[in-house]
Amino acid sequence: MSKVTPQPKIGFVSLGCPKNLVDSERILTELRTEGYDVVPSYDDANMVIVNTCGFIDSAVQESLEAIGEALNENGKVIVTGCLGAKEDQIREVHPKVLEITGPHSYEQVLEHVHHYVPKPKHNPFLSLVPEQGVKLTPRHYAYLKISEGCNHRCTFCIIPSMRGDLVSRPIGEVLSEAKRLVDAGVKEILVISQDTSAYGVDVKHRTGFHNGEPVKTSMVSLCEQLSKLGIWTRLHYVYPYPHVDDVIPLMAEGKILPYLDIPLQHASPRILKLMKRPGSVDRQLARIKQWREICPELTLRSTFIVGFPGETEEDFQMLLDFLKEARLDRVGCFKYSPVEGADANALPDQVPEEVKEERWNRFMQLQQQISAERLQEKVGREILVIIDEVDEEGAIGRSMADAPEIDGAVYLNGETNVKPGDILRVKVEHADEYDLWGSRV
C-alpha cells in the first residue's frame, strides 16, 4: 500500500470586486483539482497567492498591505490580479514577492505554483472537487462571468488598460457553466462583467451552440436561456445601451429578476461629457419611466461619483434633482479620487476634499430618504426571500430587490427552521432606509 503524502497547502487572499472573486474561484478550482489543499491561515501554507485590486488608490493600498502581511507571515507570495499589471509599483514596495502576474492569468499563476510547490500525486477518489468548482460565495448563489475587459474609455477608469478590450466568452461555455452551477445546488446566478450589456459585441453577436441548439451571443439571448434553468438570474454592471430596453419584458414575465444594476455616474451633461459617459439625462429619465410601466416591480440600482474634476454646485444640484425625479431604489456614491493612469487626473478644477465630503453627505442624506420611502411602500406586501444565514435568533435573507453584499437584507426574527438557499414567501412588517423585517407566510 502506498503511503499517503500530505497535500501541499496554499493560502489565498482575494480582494476587490465580484469579477475578481470569479478569477479567484477559477484558480482555486484548478488548485483543488490538482490536489492542493487551500488553507485559511498563512502559517499552515507552503505559499500564499494574493489576488489584488487596483481600481482606485485605496484599493491599491489595501492590496499592498495584504501582500506585506502575507510576506511577513509566510514569506512565499505570488501576486496576481489588477494591480499585478503594475509590477514595478509592487516590486518597489515588496521586492521579495516571488512572481507577479496580471489579471485573468490563470495558467501563469498555476505554472508559478507548480514551480515553487510541485503538484502532488492527486487521487481524485480522496479529494473530490465539487463539479461547480470551489466557490468563495455561499453555496446557493454564484457569480457567472460572461466577458472580460471593456471597450469604453471613461476618463475616471483604468480597467481597459488593466484588462484590455471586451472579450466575450463563448455563449455555449457560459451556459454550460450555469447549468453545472444549478445542478450543484445554486439557486441564484449573478451575471457579471465589466460591461454586461456589451456581451457579444466583439464577436458581432455570432451564433454559438448549447446542447446542439443555436444561440445568439447577446445579453438578451443569454437571459432567455438562463431563464430556462428555473433559478434567480440577476444582472450587474449594465451599461445603458438602447437594447437594455429588450430585457425589461423578460423581467416583467418573471424570466429573470426584475433588478437592474446600471451605473449612471452623474446627471450633469457637462460632467458626463468630461467622464466620456452617455449624456442625455432627460432620455434616461424617460427610459426609467417606460421600464417601470412595463415592469412595475423593477428595482433599479446605480452608482454615482461626486466631486469629479470641474463639478460645480450647479452640476451637483442637477445630480440631486435627478435623484428626486428618478427615485432609484438602491444607490452607491463615491467621492472622486484620482487613480494613477486615469485621464481625469489631467482635468482642471479639481474639487477640494472638504467640498467632496460635504456633497457626498448631502447626496447620501437625500438618497437615504428616497430609499426609505421606496422600502416603506413594501410594508404589508408579500415578497419572495432567499435565505442567506440562519442562527439561533432567526434567519437573514434577501428579496428579489437585494443583491448580496451591496444591497439590504430581510430579517426574519425567530425563523430558525430554514436553511440557506431556501426561498420563502414573507409578509413585510417593517422597513428602514436599507432593510426589511417580516414573517413567513
From Swiss-Prot:
The keyword Protein biosynthesis does not apply. [4Fe-4S] cluster 2 binds at C150, C154, C157. GO terms for molecular function: 4 iron, 4 sulfur cluster binding; aspartic acid methylthiotransferase activity; metal ion binding; protein methylthiotransferase activity. InterPro entries: Elp3/MiaA/NifB-like_rSAM, Methylthiotransferase, Methylthiotransferase_CS, Methylthiotransferase_N, Methylthiotransferase_N_sf, NA-bd_OB-fold, Ribosomal_uS12_MeSTrfase_RimO, rSAM. Keywords: 4Fe-4S, Cytoplasm, Iron, Iron-sulfur, Metal-binding, S-adenosyl-L-methionine, Transferase. It is an enzyme of class 2 (transferase). Coiled coil: none annotated. [4Fe-4S] cluster 1 binds at C17, C53, C82. Residues 376-441 form the TRAM domain. One of its GO terms (cellular component) is cytosol. It catalyses: L-aspartate(89)-[ribosomal protein uS12]-hydrogen + (sulfur carrier)-SH + AH2 + 2 S-adenosyl-L-methionine = 3-methylsulfanyl-L-aspartate(89)-[ribosomal protein uS12]-hydrogen + (sulfur carrier)-H + 5'-deoxyadenosine + L-methionine + A + S-adenosyl-L-homocysteine + 2 H(+). The keyword Cytoplasm applies. It is found in: Cytoplasm. Its cofactor is [4Fe-4S] cluster. Disulfide bonds: none annotated. Catalyzes the methylthiolation of an aspartic acid residue of ribosomal protein uS12. This is Ribosomal protein uS12 methylthiotransferase RimO. It comes from Shigella flexneri.
